[in-house]
């Protein structure tokens, strides 16, 4: 009986970590239980994070561009596994004038009860990002403003905001390169 319960619990956790939410409801993978419903369609870019030098980065400055955001953590296995493919996609898209590719993490991971002390500082995160070969911008949600705005409950989470500043889609879980490219192309 204990084995059956553990198998059931493991299945629930696995399903919970791979949900897809489409705010336009045009995909068969849409969920009516949208975590992005807390985000006003007109204010998806209305928040500020920090860059590696501690400077404010206001995402509203990217209005008029398609914005992809990857929320991740150094202690997250799926986050680490998807980085090589994210890097490949970044290399393909980085020179497009109408496109912004960002990653956001939190140096304190206050949003997550299982926070790993390895992420206590930006320096640790920057060092790990370099070790993993990340060349795309790594930004810091030091006040959990972005995580709260998007009702983040898991990492990795992928956010797609169109050039009108409207949240188009969220995807929670490890994303495959082909699917990421498909979602990015649908924003154009």
Features from the language model and the residues they span:
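Positively charged n-region of N-terminal signal peptides that target proteins for export
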Residues: 1-4
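C-terminal motif of bacterial Sec signal peptides marking the signal peptidase cleavage site
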Residues: 13-16
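N-terminal "domain-start" segment that seeds a small globular fold
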Residues: 22-59
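Conserved redox-active cysteine motifs that mediate thiol-disulfide chemistry
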Residues: 71-88
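Short, flexible/disordered intra-domain loops and linkers
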Residues: 109-119
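Short, internal strand/loop/helix patches
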Residues: 117-161
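Thiol-/selenol-based redox modules, centered on thioredoxin-like
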Residues: 154-188
């Amino acid at each position: 009986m204990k084995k059956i319960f553990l198998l059931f619990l493991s299945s629930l956790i696995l399903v919970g970590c791979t949900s897809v939410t489409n705010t336009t409801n045009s995909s068969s993978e849409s969920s009516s239980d949208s975590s992005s419903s807390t985000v006003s369609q007109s204010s998806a870019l209305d928040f500020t994070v920090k860059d590696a030098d501690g400077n404010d980065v206001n995402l509203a400055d990217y209005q008029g561009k398609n914005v992809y955001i990857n929320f991740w953590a150094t202690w997250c296995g799926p986050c680490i596994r998807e980085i090589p493919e994210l890097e490949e996609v970044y290399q393909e898209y980085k020179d497009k004038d109408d496109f912004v590719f960002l990653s956001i993490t939190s140096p304190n991971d206050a949003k997550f009860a299982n926070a790993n002390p390895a992420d206590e500082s930006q320096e640790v995160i920057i060092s790990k990002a370099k070790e993993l070969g990340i060349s795309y911008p790594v930004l810091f949600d030091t006040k959990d403003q972005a995580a709260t705005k998007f009702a983040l409950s898991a990492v990795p989470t992928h956010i797609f905001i169109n050039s009108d500043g409207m949240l188009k889609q969220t995807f929670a879980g490890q994303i495959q390169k082909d699917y990421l490219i498909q979602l990015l192309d649908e924003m154009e």
